[in-house]
Amino acid sequence: MRALPLLLLACADGAGKPSAADDSGEAPVWPPDPSTYDCSASTPPARWIDRPAGCATDPTCTETLVSGHRGAGGALGVIAPEDTVHSVYAAVAYGLDFVETDPRPTADGALVNLHDDTVDRTTSGTGDVATMTLTEVQSLQVDLVDFPGDWSCAYIPTLDEILLAARGRIDVLVDANKTDRVDLLVEAIVRTDMVEHALFDTSSVEKIDAALLIEPNLRTMIRVDSEAQLTEQLAHFASHPPVIVEINDNAPELAEVVRSLGHRPLMDVFLADASAGLTGDTTMYEAALSAGVMIPQTDRPDLLLPLVWGDDQPARRSD
């Protein structure tokens, strides 16, 4: 197994108290320079967004929060290589509230954070993750595309490494749809002391049931496609309600239904990301927020966050 980077080991929990100001008393410059979160950074960025850290996992929190897909962006992302430790740092530097993860098992039973079932798209290698050892997966060069900054240290991390990078800085959505090894997922969350800040996220009711048998205090996130499914799952989990309810982006009308039942809806906004990225038109973002989506999940936090913050933007623009 690849040794944890010294930066990661030294700085887990190093975020300090949330603050919207730097040492000079001024709000941080935004968007952040890549040197604050890439491989050249001497320390990971601290959580700076001026919001109570507990808001992310508090079902009664009414603020609009933003989740970074695969860290600071997936296939449409322009900030950092997806699903890497430094994509978590980038999400923190940008002021996101959550990062979404993609853990899947290797042949020797390690959980690596990789969206696809093969390494072909995002690395220099080829092959199915399930047939490769952790050492083989972590020896591959991550595809850096054209991300600005220094990514020479980027590699495919384990779930533990992602959780440690996030601890004290940002909350984590642990996607449980890519493996049946519920035990490994829960063990990683417990082992990294992230039970209060990692959400077990899946469309499988059975997996959530199994996870809660292992760790009854686990935070959860359900996924629903219809009002009937929403009603059924909320009844099933009445004794342990989900922290977040993810709705299908084909059914934004469910957002208000979720809210009317006292829950917070999360929805992917990838079509809006594509539209805003290509044309600069943010209409689709605005439509999602107007529909009642409280937690948009995005590949383009650089485009969505200013819209969510509006006149209350907690940072100084660098442009």
Where are the language model's segments positioned?
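Sec-dependent signal peptide recognition
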Residues: 1-6
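Phosphate-group recognition and catalysis centered on beta-loop-alpha active-site segments
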Residues: 13-16, 25-319
